[in-house]
Amino acid sequence: MKKLALILFMGTLVSFYADAGRKPCSGSKGGISHCTAGGKFVCNDGSISASKKTCTN
């Protein structure tokens, strides 16, 4: 039972880690600050994201 709980816990941690890389400005960039007029993401560290997604906010 303890092994099953440990495996489920580790699987949850791995899935959270994998999901973090799928969002623009993730990781050390600090998240999304705002959008440019051209639909690019501006990160909290001031850089422009290289994401191919379009920012609509």
Curated annotation (Swiss-Prot):
Keyword Signal: yes
Cleaved signal peptide residues: 1-20
Entry keyword set: Signal
NCBIfam families: PRK10040.1-1
UniProt-recorded name of the protein: Uncharacterized protein YdcA
Organism: Escherichia coli (strain K12)
Name of the gene: ydcA
